Amino acid sequence: DALNSSEAGRGYLTRYERAIAGKTQEQFKLETDEWQTRFDAWNANIAAAKEADPDVTWDTLNEQYGACPWPPPVTPTSQYRPTGPFRAMLERIAPYSLAGFLWYQGEEDEPYCGSYRELLGMLIGEWRAIWSENLPFLIVQLPQWIDKKVDETEGDPMLWPVLREAQWDAAQSIDNVYVICTIDCGEYDNIHPVDKRTPGERLADCAL
């Protein structure tokens, strides 16, 4: 209902409905099984390469084995379907005791950065409705990052700044929402920086 109440939410649902339209359960299973095989093989290759050379770079790994085959196919039973993570991980056990929320997410929302602010605000409101109306919500602002493809004239390097702005705007316009800056913590062509200690310490400083 919350997603259907806004244009951004309806767009999110429409993309999902288009992705699954006209497919049978057999097709969903075949797509998922084929993806899982590719994903497992890729992970095995990466693990073996890192064991052989702990200092191997992602640039080298991507050249040898290609980019990670992510995301998985969209299916009605996927954990990444609309509201899937909420239904599977939160709704069944909420509300449990907590002091606030730590949110480090947004990397894969790059294609839909224009609606991210609205969807993030809806998420904060929905979660607070379950737990407490004014629970602190701490956002890790996306770090510096440039995909190698951008240097090869593909992609748009200005989409992540739009996401950062949306995260910042949420903190400025919603009570008890805060942003932790990590613009100095990113890594070239590595969407998940190795350094997690720095963001963790900054979150702790803000929370405590």
Task: Set out the residue ranges of the language-model regions.
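Cell-envelope and extracellular/periplasmic
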Residues: 1-208
